[in-house]
Amino acid sequence: MLRFLEVVSEHIKNLRNHIDLETVGEMIKLIDSARSIFVIGAGRSGYIAKAFAMRLMHLGYTVYVVGETVTPRITDQDVLVAISGSGETTSVVNISKKAKDIGSKLVAVTGKRDSSLAKMADVVMVVKGKMKQERDEILSQLAPLGTMFELTAMIFLDALVAEIMMQKHLTEKDLEARHAVLE
């Protein structure tokens, strides 16, 4: 357990040391200029996308999760945030392509800059973390499959939320006003 926490801590330090602040600014600009924000991810990356969508809603954005029954049509005034460690997840790549064909902006959060998802994106945030296709015997025993990418992506997106809060001078109280009460 302690070894796992050490590995996670190292990945967070790596994220901090390699974060591209210019790309962060571009992401925020796209999010701010969008009529609506749509998020997508498959499997555990999908859970990360949903958590990010919740925080965007708390910040006051209009946000939808792709695949939910109440999700409307995406338009050329919207942005899609797509999360995929490999950048090759079939459903994520196909839906991202469709969004681009419609004229939507695309933000890719991925571990691979040369992936299909990254190549079609308007903004690419590379988040390093072992993907499920990579084999590292020690790391695979501690954090199997895409665990490190998923955790690192979640931390990055929460840091992005904190940055937006600071830029907009929002407080936890502001976010709390939009928090669910029907629980």
From Swiss-Prot:
Record CDD domains: SIS_PHI
Similarity annotation: Belongs to the SIS family. PHI subfamily.
Any GO BP annotation: carbohydrate derivative metabolic process
UniProt-listed Pfam families: SIS
SUPFAM superfamilies named among the record's database cross-references: SIS domain (SSF53697)
SIS domain location: 27-170
Protein name: Uncharacterized protein AF_1796
UniProt source species: Archaeoglobus fulgidus (strain ATCC 49558 / DSM 4304 / JCM 9628 / NBRC 100126 / VC-16)
PANTHER family associated with the record: 3-HEXULOSE-6-PHOSPHATE ISOMERASE
Gene Ontology MF, one: carbohydrate derivative binding
Taxonomic placement: Archaea, Methanobacteriati, Methanobacteriota, Archaeoglobi, Archaeoglobales
